[in-house]
């Protein structure tokens, strides 16, 4: 499946702003954002996203992005999903030195050479260029030998398109690929096999943020709630003191005492 065609009036698209980021995360500072999900918002411009220097997990899938320029400053980014956009290159990711997982299925990447910018990323182990379940792909995936080209270009990858290529289980996936190749339609006449349908909904196998990131996010939210309660108590105490002072001042000095 190719990326969605541009709709009338969508050329400008939406731009990421500080207000948008703060409203979706509840954070006071952009540098404090660790996890960000901006899926399917019609975004065409990443705007100030490059200021989120602490960002570790980012989902930009299902938008209208044509470039990733601001992501070049995100050195802590570990998981990135830019599937189903209009990207023709990934060059800004060359400086994302902590990137471990990249989903770029459903874009306009035409040749394996456009992945050369990823060759210097020491932590990159998971790469997806094609997602049969979501019916997303890239033009380069039309070449049956693209797998071999990607493996040669990025030898550190452990998983390509959801299939393990290094380590335990890689032999099983290789066997499946060999069987798949042998079952591809030939030029000989005969009934055409029924196309396999997805077993699960798109996004079922999507990776989610690590437990540590989720715990940290929850802790931050609890801290914000506690801080808000402190502000409320301080305001109530100030109101009580003001009322007490008003009562004392209106009573005046006491002239006599009764025992």
Swiss-Prot record:
Transmembrane segments: none annotated. Keywords: Leucine-rich repeat, Repeat. Residues 138-178 form the LRRCT domain. SUPFAM superfamilies: L domain-like. GO terms for molecular function: alpha-tubulin binding; dynein heavy chain binding. Pfam families: LRR_8 (PF13855). One of its GO terms (cellular component) is cytoplasm. LRR repeats lie at residues 32-53, 54-75, 76-97, 98-119. GO terms for biological process: outer dynein arm assembly. This is Leucine-rich repeat-containing protein 61. The gene is LRRC61.
């Amino acid at each position: 499946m190719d990326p969605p065609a541009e709709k009338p009036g969508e050329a400008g698209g939406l731009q990421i702003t500080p207000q948008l980021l703060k409203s979706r995360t509840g954070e006071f500072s952009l540098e404090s954002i660790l996890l960000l999900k901006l899926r399917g918002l019609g975004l065409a411009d990443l705007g100030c996203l490059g200021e989120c220097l602490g960002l570790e997990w980012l989902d930009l899938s299902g938008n209208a992005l044509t470039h990733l320029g601001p992501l070049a400053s995100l050195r802590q980014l570990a998981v990135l999903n830019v599937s189903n956009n209009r990207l023709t290159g990934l060059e800004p990711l060359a400086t994302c030195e902590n990137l471990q997982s990249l989903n770029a299925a459903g874009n306009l990447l035409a040749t394996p050479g456009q992945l050369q910018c990823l060759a210097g990323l020491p932590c990159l182990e998971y790469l997806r260029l094609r997602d049969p379940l979501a019916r997303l792909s890239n033009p380069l995936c039309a070449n049956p030998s693209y797998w071999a080209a990607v493996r040669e270009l990025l030898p550190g990858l452990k998983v390509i398109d959801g299939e393990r290529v290094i380590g335990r289980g890689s032999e099983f996936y290789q066997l499946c690929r060999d069987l798949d190749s042998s079952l591809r339609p030939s030029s000989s006449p005969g009934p055409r096999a029924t196309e396999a349908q997805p077993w699960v909904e798109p996004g079922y196998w999507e990776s989610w943020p690590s437990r540590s990131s989720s715990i940290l996010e929850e802790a931050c939210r609890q801290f914000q709630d506690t801080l808000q309660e402190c502000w409320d108590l301080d305001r109530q105490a100030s109101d009580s003191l003001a009322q007490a002072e008003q009562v004392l001042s209106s009573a005046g000095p006491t002239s006599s005492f009764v025992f």
